[in-house]
Amino acid sequence: MRIVSLIASATEIVHALGLGDFQVGRSHECDYPPGVLSLPVCTAPVFDTHGNSREIDQRVKETLATAESVYQVFDDVLERLEPTHIVTQTQCQVCAVSLSDVERALSARFTTRPAVVALEPNSLTDIFKDIIRLANACGVDGQPLVDRIQTEMREIAATARATKRSPRVLNLEWQEPLMGAGNWIPELTEMLGAESLLHTPIQWDDVLNADPDVVVCMPCGYDLERTRAEMHWHDWKQLRARVYLTDGNQYMTRPGPRIAKSLRILAEILYPESFEPTLEGLGWEKF
């Protein structure tokens, strides 16, 4: 078996399933566990990813208006790697290499088609289904991994709910333009007994009117340092809310085995009286 994973979350799933030795290629975004960095890179963005969130948003929109995709797949590298399995996704054409990108690469080079596993994580349930789907495609049992993750999440949620507090939380997955976090993030928030606010593209006035108790910034693909650099867009002092930054790249917007750590990050932020800050500085910080 020879696996090429073209999504960072799928690479984590592959390794959590004990299949890391079978992975032969990765995407430009696959960076965990660290050992995968030595694998051949099979993809790249077709736009400049440097710059602030407004500039990147504009470049992505311009690229989508004129090109088939915002990513390229190196079909020559794929051909050389001779994969038996390629893992991609159909959830978001902006977030990662998509199924259509892979199909174009396969049609250009391959006469014998590898198995293509397309993940679609729109919710917590989908994340667990994707783990099982990928495990089944590779001939292993994914249920023990799902059980371990779900057990950890239930324990975190039970501790949070025991506080009997329900803070009103605004999770932001992009800074400029402002976008409220959707998909599994509202579910994580509500698992802890909190209320999740504003899950769509929004304006600053919407934030002011919502009057959240807590704001959690988790820009898609951004680490703490890069998120910190994006905080200048808005006057956070206008809010009474406590404001926090998280590593959206490694945790919050990565739907893989570390989703339980994402829940833990939210729990440490929202219920500091009940959780030791074990991930502070690594996964989150106060603004």
Role assignments for model-derived ranges:
Residues 1-287:
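N-terminal ligand-binding lobe of clamshell/alpha-beta domains
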